[in-house]
């Protein structure tokens, strides 16, 4: 579904977010494509369109979107974080050769044998990241995806 400015404004308002120009631009960068983006990628997309948005504004807005559950944070490692506009239950493949993150349908992975939880807590979710790499080095050199 293409995201229009009016549609993004309505979505932000439904989630209790004041739709400033910069928040709308950041939302457009995230929701107009079916990709997982880092904060730096969001910043480049937003600033590439026309506006001069600071890195702090992007991080603050992404944190607000996380708090309001508009996006999910996918931490591949401490230095590699993606923001995922797909908030439905699902998991991920992370290609260590290309840095690409792709979705795995939740129904494709069966999680069994979780340990007993301590008293007073409940499971909020289970996030699985399957790290993959090419078994054919020539594909990595050529920049081709698996």
Predicted regions located by residue number:
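Alpha-helix C-terminal capping/helix-coil junction sites
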Residues: 13, 66-67
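Short helix-coil-helix linker/hinge
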Residues: 19-21
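Pre-recognition alpha-helix immediately N-terminal to the DNA-recognition helix
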Residues: 24-29, 41
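DNA-recognition alpha helix
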Residues: 33, 38-50
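Non-DNA-binding regulatory cores of transcription-related proteins
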Residues: 68-146
